[in-house]
């Protein structure tokens, strides 16, 4: 049995692409905008864990604003990613998650539970267990990071790589 996985490419349009931005503000005193990039009514996205994480951050002194995304066009999603201070992913299951890659492409750091393939490209400090305190710690670590070293997505998430792998697969099927 021959199985191959071709990851979805990150198709953020050029006008939305930005380098990862450092957070600028007063530690544990200023407002942070946390993006929960999904519809909170979807139980597999684990919105409750995101809210608990926000509550812990507020108990530490942060003023937390949590933005959620319901069914939105991609341009609105990318716009929300541009203005957020970080994206928080708490899903119970994901194949990607594509929103993590899109957020990074838009210049917004990601904090995530270890779901899908995030562990293959996110820094270890940005990944936490399914625990609100651990996620709050990861959020603070992410906010502290100056992102001086350029962080980019691996090449296998590019459109060119996707097309090359897809064409190779099609050629093998007809051969």
List each model region and its residues.
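Short alpha-helical donor nucleotide-sugar binding micro-motif in glycosyltransferases
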Residues: 79-84
């Amino acid at each position: 049995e021959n199985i191959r996985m071709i990851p979805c490419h990150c198709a953020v349009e050029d006008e939305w692409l930005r380098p990862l931005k450092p957070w600028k503000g007063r530690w544990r005193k200023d407002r942070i905008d946390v993006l929960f990039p999904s519809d909170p009514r979807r139980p597999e996205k684990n919105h409750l864990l995101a809210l608990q994480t926000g509550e812990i951050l507020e108990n530490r002194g942060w003023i937390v604003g949590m933005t959620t995304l319901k069914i939105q066009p991609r341009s609105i999603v990318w716009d929300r990613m541009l203005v957020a201070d970080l994206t928080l992913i708490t899903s119970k299951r994901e194949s990607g998650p594509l929103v993590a890659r899109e957020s990074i492409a838009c210049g917004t750091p990601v904090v995530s539970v270890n779901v899908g393939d995030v562990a293959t490209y996110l820094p270890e400090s940005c990944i936490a267990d399914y625990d609100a305190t651990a996620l709050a710690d990861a959020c603070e670590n992410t906010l502290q990071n100056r992102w001086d070293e350029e962080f980019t997505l691996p090449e296998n998430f590019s459109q060119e790589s996707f097309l090359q792998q897809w064409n190779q697969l099609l050629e093998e099927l007809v051969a």
